């Protein structure tokens, strides 16, 4: 589902930060300022947004994984919901250092969480004492909060989508070290450096965040649907009947 300029305006994508907090590296994407607030050039945002969505569709059609990252209060619920809708992993609470660069250690925690979930399913947790059960529950809640969104990721993602790159410098740095492409919403007070696909725009408005996250989820679903359609067509194309004549 494509996003229109009107939708971007209504979501407040064009509203940047106060002019005194600006990052000069965002100058090419700034239209001007009003009441000491920088105004983002939506014509540039639209083009760059479309380029990012094109990349995500292509990645998804090749069964790529996109990790959604948004831990600010106004982004958490949206990031989790849209990532789940697209069947993708997400980080909505806190970025743990080494989440990408030290994934081997993170996998140990994921294994522990899955073991705990299995204990609940098979009822073995019922055998714990009251004190043990309380400790079990506390540990499970803590693990769910920190890695619940990535427990089915399986490995390093093919790309990460980040809302507010300044707030998630750790994620950007780790992605850069591993050569993982970053699709990032960059407001006027942050640097676009380290972001492969820059989406210049408001990173504080919940409406704007919903627009970005919904767009990424839609692009993933479209890419997956296109891949399925291509597969069906290729199977149909291979069903042509060929008569083989018997040799005497």
Swiss-Prot record:
Keywords per UniProt: Ribonucleoprotein, Ribosomal protein
Gene Ontology biological-process annotations: translation
MF terms in GO: structural constituent of ribosome
Keyword Ribosomal protein annotated: yes
Cited PROSITE patterns: RIBOSOMAL_S2_1
Domain of life: Bacteria
InterPro entries given in the database record: Ribosomal_uS2, Ribosomal_uS2_bac/mit/plastid, Ribosomal_uS2_CS, Ribosomal_uS2_flav_dom_sf
GO cellular component entries: cytosolic small ribosomal subunit
Family as reported in the entry's similarity comment: Belongs to the universal ribosomal protein uS2 family.
NCBIfam families in alphabetical order: rpsB_bact (TIGR01011)
Annotated protein name in UniProt: Small ribosomal subunit protein uS2
Lineage of the organism: Bacteria, Pseudomonadati, Pseudomonadota, Betaproteobacteria, Burkholderiales
